[in-house]
Amino acid sequence: MSVRHRVSLFALVVLLPLAQAAFAQTPTIDYVVSAPQPEQRWLQVDVRFPARAGTPLDVRMARSSPGRYATHEFGKNVYLFEARGAGEAVLPVEQVAPAHWRVTPTDGVVRVRYRLFADHIDGTYSAVDGTHAHLNAPATFVWAPALPETPITVRFVQPPGRNWRVSTQLFPTDDPLAFTAPNLQYLMDSPVEFSAHAVREFTVAYPGGGTPARIRLAVHHLGTEAQLDAYAAMVETIVREQAAIFGTLPTFDGGTYTFLMDYLPWADGDGMEHRNSTVCTAAASLADGMARVAGTASHEFFHAWNVERIRPASLEPFDFSQANMSGELWLAEGFTSYYGSLAMIRAGIVAQDRGVAQLAMFAGAVMRAPGAQFRSAVDMSRLAPYVDAAQAVDPTNWENTYVSYYTYGAAIGLGLDLTLRERSGGTVTLDDYMRTLWKTHGVPGGKAPGYVSRPYTLKDAEAALATVSGDAAFAADFFRRHVLGTEPLPFRRLFAAAGYTLRERETPPTLGTLGLTAQQGRMVVTNNTVATSAVYKAGVGRGDTILSLNGTAVTQAGDWERILSTLTPGTEVELAFESRGEKKTARVTVQSNDRVEAIPMAERTPQQEALRAAWLASRVK
């Protein structure tokens, strides 16, 4: 047999099966993230996409992010974008749109490389510097719309001279710097902290037994080990208190939930929920007040149930190419705000009366906001693409036409909780409502990590209330008046049922918030005046100049407040101002501040005591 024949036989016997095995393997999308010069705030991202020779492959940068509802042009920070095939030959790249590239491969691979400028530490964006890489996936990774279910690998490269660790909800491998995601939805929902951060962890058992859930805190901060120990213990009380509301923790993918926390002077304050993790950032340190930053952790952890698994159909699956509008954010975000605060009270981190005073701020904001008469909670939710960290150059009138769906929804959650307790004698609560949503829409899970099989609609949310209350007419009426409509809840009566008086706060006299700023020797109004204020009724608007109040000139910072402090609510005074070049005067009536507060009643009935205790006491057994 000749050598040529022997080689051919080898090829048939050995190489062909290997080739067939390689062909049979599921193709993957492979990312490599490196930071050769982290101090200069840029990352290098290399991606290998499987492709078909001759078939164009579209590659995009996301324009929205899970947990955010506005458009965010992440592509603006991408540069030096290039593509190659399996070899080193550069492939032509057609830029179809600002964050949309098209590459036609000559073989079965498209390899993309680009640089990403990243210098904003919060939940939405990405950041890299000499101390860490803090990554939100949609702000970091390009993706191929044609490959939504292709498995993914992500590998991180240590920056020069560093020995960082990676914390993320991505699935680990034997390599501590390499991870996987089963699909695009899961990748884009998986933030990363790559730094020399500290880690604390604890476990929480499931009622039915099995492997306990592992809860990790990955904390990049400048504090002490003792401070972190104390903070981890505080977060543990929150986690256990929230688990008691539902009776169980969610089944986390991989068995672990991770708090990714950056408490650094150069960070922005933020929180962003994800399926098996959350990002919490603040410029505050643990020494500045743990309860303050723990409030964000409480809100975000409640999202592990509410929004991540009890998920609006309007957000499932998430569309990374545009803003995702949802009419359910009053429930997804607003009820989470309510329970984030309530859990802090039940866990004993915030004193009960102080905590109720904070909850009353939700009610007060909706009671006094002009915008609440124009739009329902559903309407406010649908405005999120315009307001959720969205940017606008032209002025808006949100002061008079908008109430945050966080606040509006929290007020509805508060009012519904007290309503259910009052009408049932304490046998039915909002906890029961959340458990019903959980069993119906959360427990069924999804076809794969990153998906939810039974997302809910507004009709589903109403049906759950009918089930819990045992009264479909009540549920329909509540939704018609307070969710789809703009009728306010009877908060004074509801707080009284729990032994609290809701009243106007005693505050300094006011004519309305002006936001005065000195500009070229003139005191200029820099914000829209609020429709319920005296200055609004007088015709004062943004850009106008205040000349005098009650006969005294207003020429520098502090003059306005100083003059107001000498006046009495109910008094009528003269206001002089200039609007669009025209000098005007108006008679205005001094007002008291329109904020409300909850004051514990000195004497409470047994019924009030029972409702208050059941509402605010710990559920942990």
Model-derived segments and spans:
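Short, hydrophobic/aromatic-enriched beta-strand segments in well-ordered soluble domains
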Residues: 45-51, 61-63, 99-130, 152-160, ...
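A surface-exposed beta-strand-loop module
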Residues: 35-36, 67-129, 144
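Surface-exposed beta-strand/loop patches in extracellular or lumenal glycoproteins
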Residues: 42-75, 139-159, 166
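C-terminal recognition in membrane/secretory proteostasis and scaffolding
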Residues: 340-341, 350-621
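Zn2+-dependent metallopeptidase catalytic core
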Residues: 74-83, 117, 149-167, 171, ...
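Juxtacatalytic substrate-recognition/specificity segment
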Residues: 203-329
